[in-house]
């Protein structure tokens, strides 16, 4: 089967089989209880008395349970490609030579038991089916647990290098492909002495070597030098923009809203008036001022709409298009939200619903809100993207980009899975907590 079968079809089939088995098991218990209460089953010594119709009813249900379990055993063969038994993840010597044969045998026993339950409908003798069920239970213990453990301990562990060699090779190949490193090539590069001619031929590149590093110390410097009232710089990212007609490396940060610094901390101030940050702060990465500060530039990009209604530090909600004027960005007279990313409060019912959701009665009582007003929620770009596509994993460091006169946020998304056959589980313990890959996986692609 192709990889898509293991990542998509197999989990669905497993879920359906498990759900059906649990449902039929519950129905069987319910049916037995009903027959006991209605007299179909009379508990008396030396053995219960069961009506013929009741036997048939229960026999069919037990046969169905056995068939479903046989299907589960059959699907388990594919699930073993991600087993954790042996030196590596996936099919190992023990899985291949002990567990797989045992699972196939259990599937056959389950089908045989189902057939005997159906035969009991005619013969009215449950003894063969009961004996088969007992044999099934013994084989499940011996073949599913004892035998594989014995093979692992007595055969594999003393001869692991010989027994597991080909399975380790399969694991390495699958892991490299699952993590996207199977196409990596190595090249040996030898560097000679740097000559004057080489320096003169690469002056432009040398002049653009990054000196301003986007580290925490530089974030503090940007925040101190370029911070505006009610706004702050929380993060810096490297990027490239055209500076004086030449594409240059720059360090860029978003001037985000900081409600802790605003003067008006009333409900209107924090939800209707101070609703956004303002623009970007930039500095060429290869330049410093004589004072030692970055060479800040305000003319690298021209923003028609510098307002940042969404940014990583924003929490809670904001309401726009109200009768209250929002705080304008520097150089602007007014700030009017022109987007449609909010939920319009077009009725009293909607206002009441949001008030209950936020436990905030001001959403109902405020006279500043009208039918054109919008509620902006999930204003953190990562949280917003995660709500939109919960099946993806998103990087914890969105970065701002000036595009078409406004600021947009770019965020990396990953497709991940823990079900790639034969591949080893990735060790994520050394990743930055904000990397977005905080769960068990053995397959990842930076696809989004």
What residues fall within each predicted segment?
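Soluble extracytoplasmic regions of secretory-pathway and membrane proteins
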Residues: 1-448
